[in-house]
Amino acid sequence: MAVWRSCLRASSSRHRLSSLFFSHHLKPSSFISHSPPLFSPSPSPSPTCFSPLHRLLSSGPEFPIGSQEIIPTDDSSLPVLAVVDFLEGFHEFTGLPWWMIIASSTVAVRLALLPLLILQLKKLKTISELLPKLPMPIPETPTLKGSIDQFSHFLKESRAIGCPSFLWFFPYLSVQLPCFFLLMASIRKMSLDGHPGFDSGGVLWFQNLSDLPGGSFGPVFPILIATFHYINIQISFDTSTIRQTTGLTGLLMRYYKLYLEILSVPLFFVGYAIPQGSLVYWVTNSSVNIFQQLSLKHPTVGAKLGLLSQGATPGMGHSMEISESVIKYVDSDSKEQTLSLQTLTPEELLSLSVQVLSKGDKETSIQLLRLALEKDPGYVRGLVLMGQALLQKTQLSEATEYLELAISKLLDEDPSDAEDVELLMLASQWAGAAYVQQGKLKSGIIHLERVAKLREPGDPKSKEHYFEALLLLSSALYKEGQSDEAAKILRVVVDHNPAYKPLLEQCEDENELVSDLVSRRKDHF
């Protein structure tokens, strides 16, 4: 008991001395800028007289801790503190106001990440050029084993032709997102902690960077955040790309774009709950993103950086306007040129049509093809491409007319070179597909059997077209009740791509069932 009393007396005397020291030497304002941590450490249960070293370390050299003796802690992570120190040093070095420090630091970070973005875009350009030469990564009728085999075959073929790794879709995003949130967290900490100079570091309506948006100009930042987000979505998901993407992928893209557009509404309200210092950073980052996207999409910039696809000219492929019989485009010197469509050859018109069709503009593509065929009605490549364009628009009857005409011309000339054989294969495949879609299975089978009689091509892309035609032929034969013939064709397809083995098994099982029924009827009679 005597020991405990002496400890308590010592603690009480120290309490009075420390209180006297703080009342004379420390102003109340010195505690305002140091807000307590959200989760304070629990006080030690041991008496203070048993921990003199702890008190010495916790008090610090200049500001001894008072009666509560709580160790000052900072719940911020080391990266956040490092960014805060860097921004403070940049501010002291330049003497610029804080809003300019935040904005310029944002621009500097985005410029530092730009080389990585350009490298990623170049890799993705190479992937997009090689992807049409590769087989599908997932079979049309996926099963676990079939999907694994098909994907392994896809990876093997991609390595064989030198296709970059598909991990190149992620590097920029995996670096940019952490940088965005790190800067956001650092500036938010400075705003909430009342960092020196933040109370007068703004300009115009946002003088105090630590305050939340308010007053008559309060909606400005939230509106800018929501608007810039919406604009970024429209630039990223351009309408022609979404229109061109069909099937499940196109549907998912459309719904994902809609989801991101709807996010603009909650982002507007989120803007009211963020300090104005953080809002300066967010708005600057969004505006830089808009400028960066528009710049990289510009044909001249794309050509300088080597981001344009091979064979695509900046003017004709990316910045082009067609009105009546005139085409306006930007040439390699970034000068706007006007050209009459009547002066172009059928080959040039077809090249333009292919580029327009790749953007999803089927109407303009068909318009150019009609003009090319007016100049040369026997232009076989133009006839085949016209049939394909009309087939995409589901104008099946007109598509078959052009494809039949192309096939007859090719057969009359007895195609021997590789280009004519490929045209015959494509025209026959698309004509067969058009007839099958119209329910004219017999007419479709005639054209598809013509493809089956051709020699298997060596080019990977042509080979995929060849086996797609065989698969379509087996489907038509199966629907016509010729399951034996369908199974023969499917065996050839499965030898090329094992992912279609379940279809073959289904076809063979039905053949066995039919044979069993026939034998039973013979036994009955």
UniProtKB/Swiss-Prot annotation:
Q: Does the keyword Transmembrane helix apply?
A: yes
User: One GO CC annotation, please?
Assistant: chloroplast thylakoid membrane
Q: Where are the transmembrane segments?
A: 99-119, 167-187, 217-237, 262-282
Q: Where does this protein reside within or beyond the cell? A: Plastid, Chloroplast thylakoid membrane
How does the UniProt record describe the way this protein sits in the membrane?
Multi-pass membrane protein
Signal sequence: where?
Answer: none
Task: Please verify whether the record's keywords include Chloroplast.
Answer: yes
Q: Name one GO biological process term.
A: mitochondrial cytochrome c oxidase assembly
Residue windows of the TPR repeats: 346-379, 380-413, 425-458, 467-500
- UniProt KW keywords: Chloroplast, Membrane, Plastid, Repeat, Thylakoid, TPR repeat, Transit peptide, Transmembrane, Transmembrane helix
Give this protein's Gene Ontology molecular function annotations. membrane insertase activity
Q: Which residues form a coiled coil?
A: none
Q: InterPro entries, per this entry?
A: TPR-like_helical_dom_sf, YidC/ALB3/OXA1/COX18
Mind telling me which PANTHER family this protein's record contains? ALBINO3-LIKE PROTEIN 2, CHLOROPLASTIC, OXA1
Question: What is the role of the protein in this entry?
Answer: Probably required for the insertion of integral membrane proteins into the chloroplast thylakoid membranes.
Q: Which family does it belong to?
A: Belongs to the OXA1/ALB3/YidC (TC 2.A.9.2) family.
Report what the protein is called: ALBINO3-like protein 2, chloroplastic
Species of the source: Arabidopsis thaliana
The organism that produces this protein has a lineage beginning with: Eukaryota, Viridiplantae, Streptophyta, Embryophyta, Tracheophyta
